[in-house]
């Protein structure tokens, strides 16, 4: 059994986290981390509310790990420098994470894979951000769909319990690295960003009633009918599988919204 890092990115939660589940199940010790990536942050305006949103949820995630007797190490800088140095200094054997499909992320992860491989450190990715990756729902001729309706039909036909599996981590939490280590958690101001919240962020909870009546309420501005969960799905504070399980039984319109995102 090895000593591993779990690198949180677009998955700011512990519950139903595929990559974290994989790391905990296959490692004797797992240290969760988050990196505020300067290659991304340096391109953003200083009052970008997405950064504040992420910062707040990283704080919540850190507190959640501390309640479990562990901690989330939070870094600020270039992942290409931080991860090789961290694995060497702390003698980690592998790094686990959930796959990110943005062009920058794909290039970054390929470089990190090569850097870690040169140091005999394994780099593992898991599917967590989507139900189906782009090569999993294709036309009969093997080509990708360009029209939503036939794509959604194929998507629904393929959906089963395997793709909606809940990655419960509770039985493996004993493998989290224990103790709180002093890794300096910089303030937003130290990173050059404003901590002034310009508007209330959507809540990271939904209800069966909201999903069930989503298509009836969403077009009425005076009614709180939209789920407002897109930002939470984007940064993984809630599980796409959990929402799909609810929508599958309660509201096809809401499920179609998730398919459109996929």
Segments from the language model and where they lie:
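Glycine/tryptophan-enriched, flexible segments
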Residues: 121, 147-262
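Trp/Phe/Arg-rich N-terminal binding region typifying the photolyase-homology
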Residues: 1-159, 250
């Amino acid at each position: 059994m090895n000593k591993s890092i779990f690198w949180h990115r677009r998955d700011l939660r512990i519950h139903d986290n595929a990559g974290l589940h994989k790391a905990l199940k296959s490692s004797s010790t797992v240290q969760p981390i988050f990196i505020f990536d300067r290659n991304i942050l340096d391109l953003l305006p200083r009052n970008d509310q997405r950064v504040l949103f992420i910062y707040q949820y990283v704080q919540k995630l850190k507190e959640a790990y501390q309640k479990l007797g562990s901690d989330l190490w939070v870094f600020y800088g270039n992942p290409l420098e931080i991860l090789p140095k961290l694995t060497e200094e702390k003698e980690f054997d592998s790094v686990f994470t959930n796959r990110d499909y943005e062009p920058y992320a794909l290039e970054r992860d390929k470089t990190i894979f090569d850097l870690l491989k040169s140091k005999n450190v394994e780099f593992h990715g898991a599917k967590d951000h989507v139900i189906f990756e782009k090569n999993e729902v294709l036309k009969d001729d093997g080509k990708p769909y360009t029209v939503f309706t036939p794509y959604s039909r194929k998507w629904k036909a393929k959906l089963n319990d395997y793709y909606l599996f809940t990655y419960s981590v509770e039985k493996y939490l004993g493998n989290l690295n224990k103790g709180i280590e002093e890794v300096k958690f910089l303030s937003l101001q130290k990173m050059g960003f404003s901590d002034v919240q310009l508007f209330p962020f959507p809540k990271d909870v939904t209800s069966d009633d909201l999903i069930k009546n989503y298509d009836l309420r969403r077009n009425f501005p005076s009614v709180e009918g939209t789920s407002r969960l897109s930002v939470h799905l984007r940064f993984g504070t809630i599980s796409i599988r959990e929402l799909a399980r609810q929508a599958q039984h309660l509201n096809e319109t809401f499920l179609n919204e998730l398919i459109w995102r996929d």
